[in-house]
Amino acid sequence: MKEKEKIEVSFTFNTSELLYDIKNYAYIEGNIMPDDERKFQVRDIDEDGNINRLIRVLNLAYAECVEMLYPYSKDEVNTKEKDSNLELLDCYVIDAVLPIGFSQTSVNILSSLIHEYMVYRVVADWLSINKPESQGNWEIKLVDIKDKIKSTIANRRGPVKRRLQPF
């Protein structure tokens, strides 16, 4: 692809919005449970002791999304070492280089799907620990969102060109 045939797009996901949705889903899942101790465990996803797990899975979900957008998001390795320090970022940014013919609506759809994927990934992990009977529902949603992301990428690579002769 020539340089002028590409456009750079940054997908930005504010951590505060991701956390709001994650906490909201955890609250709803906990609220519909019968009154018992587990109800509060499910709803307390952002408590001090639990936030480390949330950050780790959110960072993993971000990395998975960057990988799903390959070849548009490929980054060369820029360091020879990587630590596992937990860091909650202000926002998660995915830089992608898309072909000029890539649809703006596809970019909008991808942005929404990636946001949902990151949220669902954290909620599914949290429920696998605290409410295993609901975790399967979130895993199904997660697989569905992942398929939609891949489908959006595959279907929007450019305009269809039909040859005049079939053979």
Annotate each language-model stretch with its function.
Residues L60-A63, E116-S128:
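Short, hydrophobic/amphipathic alpha-helical patches that form generic packing surfaces
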Residues M1-V107, K141-V143, D147-F167:
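Conserved short "hinge" loops at termini or chain/domain junctions
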Residues V107-E116:
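Structural motif
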Residues K131-I140:
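Short conserved catalytic/interaction loops centered on acidic-Pro-aromatic/His motifs
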Residues D125, N130-K131, K146-D147:
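Mixed-charge, glycine-accented linear interaction segment located at domain edges/termini
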